[in-house]
Amino acid sequence: MNFLLNDEKTISDNEYKIRKELYDTFITLPSDFLSRMRHFQPQIGCFNNCSFCSKFSVCKSEHWNESTIRNIISAIKYAALNYTHDEPLLAWNRFEHRLGVIFPYLDNDIGSYPYLDKFIELGYKELGVKTRISTVGFSRHNLRLNEMHKFIASSNLIMALAGVRLSISQYGRVYEDKNSNTSLEEYQHDISNFLKIYKPYYDKFG
């Protein structure tokens, strides 16, 4: 078992070791761990601290980089092949709620995750799952996030999306001063920017 993903020809010895250890752990768990998984988070915590959120997340965030995403998805893929050879290779037995769809958020805002495009792409190409995203938005001045979301909403990944939800909130505590770059007026422009970026998705799927 080489633990390679479809776009990989080789991996380092350390990556192989990590993937093997994850695989060995996953196959000791009940098959429901994979077959009925719903929340699959590459990020925890949230900078926004919105007052309406019921999760009481802390105002800091940690997340997986692309290497970690690859290692975990590889281990999931090869573990799932012990139970099924048909896609999706995750959440394939969750018939009561959106079979084959993963939710990468619970106590976090996935819209601010800087590797979301890689997470969605690898989940779709390697596991055959679609991803639903939910966010309160992001600054239109953040070039990295804007380019990433434009890529997600383009023809490259649009079929890998299972829903795009925008929660209307003034980013909790940070959007308060009307004279700053985090004013409510700025937030309105950010919402407009978000809807413009994801217009291709809404046009295609409603």
Model region roles, listed by residue range:
Residues 14-15, 26, 50, 94-96:
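Short amphipathic alpha-helical segments, especially helix-boundary/capping motifs
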Residues 37, 54-70, 79-119, 123-144, ...:
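Core AdoMet radical
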Residues 3-4, 16, 29, 75, ...:
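Residue-level signal for functionally critical sites in structured catalytic/ligand-binding pockets
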Residues 1-40, 57:
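N-terminal [4Fe-4S]-dependent radical SAM core
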Residues 22, 26, 46-49, 72-76, ...:
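N-terminal uDENN/longin-like adaptor modules and analogous extended polar/low-complexity scaffolding regions
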